[in-house]
Amino acid sequence: MPRNTSHEHDHGLMVEASKPEVAPPPRYQVLLLNDDYTPMDFVVTVLEQFFNLNLEQATQIMLHVHTRGRGVCGVYSREVAESKVAQVNEFSRMNQHPLLCTMEQA
């Protein structure tokens, strides 16, 4: 009688394929920093244009930045955060405002 080779070394143990644990990529907060020169309406425009916020959301964040010195505009992957920081800073300089946008790991 032929031996069943598929079960020849089966000792009742089940081998489960291991799945590598992959941590999610780090997220980054994009921040606006308050200054004494940039008009509030310009900050609202930046928040609407670059972060797709509505007027109410943009106004709330602008007031938070104004009263607390800085505020989170959104949380993104590193590449997206870097792009938004560069876009906002370039837009601010083009419009001759000192508004500063930065990022930090969330």
Swiss-Prot record:
Q: Where is the composition biased (Basic and acidic residues)?
A: 1-13
From the Swiss-Prot or TrEMBL record, give the protein name.
ATP-dependent Clp protease adapter protein ClpS
Q: How does it assemble?
A: Binds to the N-terminal domain of the chaperone ClpA.
Q: Which Gene3D superfamilies does UniProt cross-reference here?
A: 3.30.1390.10
Q: Which organism is it from?
A: Xanthomonas oryzae pv. oryzae (strain KACC10331 / KXO85)
Q: What high-level taxonomic lineage is stated for the organism?
A: Bacteria, Pseudomonadati, Pseudomonadota, Gammaproteobacteria, Lysobacterales
Which family does the record assign?
Belongs to the ClpS family.
Q: Which residues form the signal peptide?
A: none
Region entry Disordered, spans: 1-20
> What's an example GO BP annotation here?
protein catabolic process
Q: Name one Pfam family in it.
A: ClpS
Q: What does the UniProt function comment say about this protein?
A: Involved in the modulation of the specificity of the ClpAP-mediated ATP-dependent protein degradation.
List residues traversing the bilayer. none
